[in-house]
Amino acid sequence: MSDTTLEKIIVLDYGSQYNQLIARRIREIGVFSELMSHKVTAKEIREINPIGIILSGGPNSVYDEGSFDIDPEIFELGLPVLGICYGMQLMSYKLGGMVEAAGEREYGVAPLQLTEKSALFAGTPEVQDVLMSHGDRVTAIPEGFHVVGTSPNSPFAAVENTERNLYGIQFHPEVRHSVHGTEMLRNFALNICGAKGNWSMENFIDMQIKDIREKVGDKKVLLGLSGGVDSSVVGVLLQRAIGDQLTSIFVDHGFLRKGEADQVMETLGGKFGLNIIKVDAQKRFMDKLVGLSDPETKRKIIGNEFVYVFDDEANKLEGVDFLAQGTLYTDVIESGTDTAQTIKSHHNVGGLPEDMQFQLIEPLNTLFKDEVRALGTQLGMPDEIVWRQPFPGPGLAIRVLGDLTEEKLETVRESDAILREEIAASGLERDVWQYFTVNTDVKSVGVMGDQRTYDYTLAIRAITSIDGMTADFAQLPWDLLQKISKRIVNEVDHVNRIVYDITSKPPATVEWQ
């Protein structure tokens, strides 16, 4: 967001697993919020011009050498500050209080007893459940602070210094276990920080269009269109901002879901008027992969070949200065914070060549996935694109175990279409986070029409999840599974057996390879 007049509350990142959740909760209230490194200085914050600051929780102990610190001048900015868990301990410690290891650690839900009236807790009950997760606790509060809430193991569970607009809570209001946590965050954002609460997808669109037009001017923009949610939303947003200055390249590598390529062209090219160059590269990709069985080799070849195809097409265009990408805020957080952990790489189709000298445009890089979907809806995009499931860059090719053949690929494409059809008809489409079929490369004996068969076994994978980092298998109704199995076996050639994957993540990953 380039607009410094935008009301925003910044969250300083101290390593809590709930950091993103804090920003999401504030945004749900209607106030823009973003994570920043705990190394940010008071001077830098003054330039950003936020209306409030939240110090997140984290795994450190404030008294340990090398623990995450804060510029003490931040407390002198006159801005409202809310310290959560470690953030509260750090604020107390830096301002003259004491923090020690708790004699009895406090993990899980605990009753919070309010002892005084407080603007932070306005409209919440005197006794309420909150989520505690700490091994240290404040044992003496700084001068000017007073206690407004206690818990069985935390005599200073909630403290404040109203003269300096400083607030500290030992629990996590951002998680649902803290029953009235959202009300506390709303009180902080709207009443204490004075936000109007009018941040929305509608004004996000207006601001982005203004930013894009100012940045691009009369120059041209290139977009790699995959047909997924992120690149599709970027395409429609850019089309609204700069019209025919945008050119999209859509590479059909032959591993898309049934009807997907046609839908992309009809919806984005037809209804929304995007100028799309469709590259039919199915034979080119398949020729490189025939007979290969190692999943990493397949991924690498698909990624590299995609880059070569994209590069070939991009070089045919003249006068392109900008490259648009569907980078999300989660990508920025994972790669750009001091506390981020390295996670398993996603099934990306590969990076672009280093010698492609474009300026980047990433209009979604301040949004979470659910906000991208909301943006797509606000832009008038159909549900079948906005709610499209996560799909790996290499596509159906990595849902075929063993060597890749046209026959096996077709079993996955056709069975996947049946699975999606039946789950949609059952009304469970939004309840199941992701679902697909896999050709296991295992053949088994069967009987069909009094004839012995020896055909493929397909697996159905369906999971429930919030963010894909962890997942449980979806407990689909047995009659639905039976119907899906019957249809696949009857309608898809070379398949005679269906199994259901009931493994959670971890220990399994979502995809089979």
Curated annotation (Swiss-Prot):
Q: Which reaction does it catalyse?
A: XMP + L-glutamine + ATP + H2O = GMP + L-glutamate + AMP + diphosphate + 2 H(+)
Catalytic-site annotation from UniProt: 85 (nucleophile), 172, 174
Which GO-annotated molecular functions does the record name? ATP binding; GMP synthase activity
Would the keyword Nucleotide-binding be found if you checked this record's keyword annotation? yes
Record has Nucleotide-binding as a keyword: yes
Gene3D superfamilies the record matches = 3.30.300.10, 3.40.50.880, HUPs
In Pfam terms, one family for this protein is GMP_synt_C
Q: Which residues form the GMPS ATP-PPase domain?
A: 199-388
- Mention any one GO cellular component term assigned to this protein in its UniProt record: cytosol
Q: Where does ATP bind?
A: 226-232
Q: Which UniProt keywords apply?
A: ATP-binding, Glutamine amidotransferase, GMP biosynthesis, Ligase, Nucleotide-binding, Purine biosynthesis
SUPFAM superfamilies annotated for this entry? Answer: Adenine nucleotide alpha hydrolases-like, Class I glutamine amidotransferase-like, GMP synthetase C-terminal dimerisation domain
- Record NCBIfam families: guaA_Cterm, guaA_Nterm, PRK00074.1
Do you know which PANTHER family this protein is assigned to?
GMP SYNTHASE [GLUTAMINE-HYDROLYZING], GMP SYNTHASE-RELATED
Q: How is the quaternary structure described?
A: Homodimer.
Q: What does this protein do?
A: Catalyzes the synthesis of GMP from XMP.
By what name is this protein known? Answer: GMP synthase [glutamine-hydrolyzing]
Source organism (scientific name): Lactococcus lactis subsp. cremoris (strain MG1363)
* Lineage per the UniProt record: Bacteria, Bacillati, Bacillota, Bacilli, Lactobacillales
